[in-house]
Regions:
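Short beta-strand elements in bilobed, periplasmic/extracellular small-molecule ligand-binding domains
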Residues: 21-24, 42-62
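Glycine-enriched alpha-helix->loop->beta-strand junction motifs that scaffold or abut catalytic
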Residues: 97, 117-121
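Hydrophobic alpha-helical
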Residues: 41, 56-112
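Paired acidic/hydrophobic, glycine-rich loop segments that form the ligand-binding mouth/hinge
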Residues: 78, 122-124
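Class I S-adenosyl-L-methionine
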Residues: 3, 10, 39-42, 46, ...
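Hydrophobic alpha-helical segments within soluble ligand-binding/sensing domains
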Residues: 1-20, 64, 107-111, 126-146
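Extracytoplasmic ligand-binding site segments that recognize negatively charged/polar headgroups
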Residues: 3, 23-41
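Hinge/cleft segment of the Venus flytrap/periplasmic-binding protein
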Residues: 130-179
Length: 179
């Protein structure tokens, strides 16, 4: 998912991020998923000249917005989970990110709202159903055999932009977000 976010940022700037800066935010900085997303994103942008100015990992939900507002100005805020995308979106909507563009991973109606209002540029939506199904499948396999090694699997995702938010293809995704 982090790689997908990096690809979208690179597409928007034709691969040229020289002289641009970013901050990365994740609600749970110590989780395995956050680590993979961070590594995937950084692999995608590491040779582009993009400067990482700050990271905000493992913050408390209620204080996330205050921390975001206190960070130095950047060109982009990359949010690696839904809670972070919502916090960054709310700050951007209130003009409290000093013009930073938000690129995030999320699966809530609030994240979609910030995309719709222009507070976020891009939303990568993980297929949570598939992730849950794969997780349960691996758990059952592990119960059947003590020698079974859990495999890491890629979770499918959808990239949504403001202009494609209400497309026919995304209607089902929006419906499941609202449930």
């Amino acid at each position: 998912l982090g790689e997908a976010l990096a690809e979208e940022l690179l597409k928007d700037y034709s691969g040229s991020l020289e002289g641009k800066s970013l901050g990365i935010v994740a609600e749970s900085g110590s989780s395995y998923a956050s680590g993979l997303r961070m590594a995937g994103f950084w692999n995608g942008v590491s040779r582009t000249g993009l400067e990482l100015r700050w990271t905000m990992l493992g913050y408390a939900r209620e204080s996330g917005q205050e921390f975001l507002e206190s960070k130095p100005q950047v060109d982009f805020v990359v949010a690696l989970d839904d809670a972070s995308t919502r916090a960054a979106g709310q700050c951007a909507a209130g003009g409290r990110l000093q013009g930073a563009l938000v690129y995030g991973i999320g699966n809530s109606t609030e994240a979609a709202y910030y995309l719709d209002t222009g507070a976020a540029e891009c939303l990568v939506v993980p297929d949570s159903f598939q992730a849950g199904y794969q997780s349960l499948t691996e758990t059952v396999r592990g119960m059947d055999s003590y020698l079974h090694q859990v495999e890491s699997r890629q979770v499918s995702h959808t990239v949504i932009r403001r202009d494609t938010l209400f497309s026919r293809e995304n209607q089902e995704i929006l419906f499941t977000m609202s449930q």
